[in-house]
């Protein structure tokens, strides 16, 4: 991963950012300068609500407007085409008439079949990722690439920023003995690549079966050292429980609480920022955590009640119970290490 970061696919400027920078995502570069990639193509689009252009128009609408382009099918990842579903929820789009055929790749079907790709000669992948290994959108990417290789379909990845920067790495590399859909590649927890760079690495390192014909539409104006809010791009929460960039920064480490008996804050308006349980002493916990002097972060004692929130968490841990714990407050995101903090 570090070698790929140094490959200068995107530059690492390391200069002070005085104002927000204009960045064009892959979808905008495609539509403005690379239309020859999709002309006369029959397309399968892998996307969700985050697949928008610079004017917030969904990519599927833009593609349907292009002459001599036929959008045959849309594949949606976890959380659905419109980001309407909480983690793990299965989705059915059979009743939507105004769109091309929409097929969920989460649930019983996670790889496009030969029937699903019938008459398709190009797969476009365009989803905003978060930069954490256990975000399942990147697992969907690999499985789509496997199907593309098996059925001889080209893959075009429209690149988007890594919102938590492209020059930082945190956490251990996954041991493939524990490979699941939630951890699919031997990469660090926070891997510091864009989705396009990761696609190239997946192919180059042979982490999937086959070797699909792969091409990346690079962004324009993005550099590795940029946080998402240092661009002029609007924030669209990539999944229901990542409402803002600060949550995305905290997520790689604090998501590990999901596997414990501690609430990770689902069922509140601050998932992953709040954590606790009914039996915790919030004062003592916050004191102990602050005494660790972890860089770039402080902990505030809090009380909260996880409750069902439609589209975010229907059945949160400790539902309707009073929980005591801490709120994590990042004071210096350049020094903050989410994974180290989560493990502490």
Explain the meaning of each model-derived region.
Residues 1-5:
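Conserved small/polar residues in nucleotide/adenosyl-binding loops
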Residues 26-31, 39, 47-49, 55-57, ...:
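C-terminal and late-domain segments of enzyme folds
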Residues 68-70, 150-154:
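A short helix->loop->beta-strand "cap" motif at the edges of active sites that frequently abuts
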Residues 70-78, 158:
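Short internal beta-strands
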Residues 83-87, 156-178:
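Glycine-rich, charge-decorated loop segments at or immediately adjacent to ligand/cofactor-binding or catalytic sites
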Residues 87-120, 132:
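Glycine-rich oxoanion-binding loops at beta->alpha junctions
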Residues 129-141:
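Glycine/threonine-rich flexible loop motifs
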Residues 275-344:
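Conserved functional hotspot residues or short segments at active or partner-binding sites
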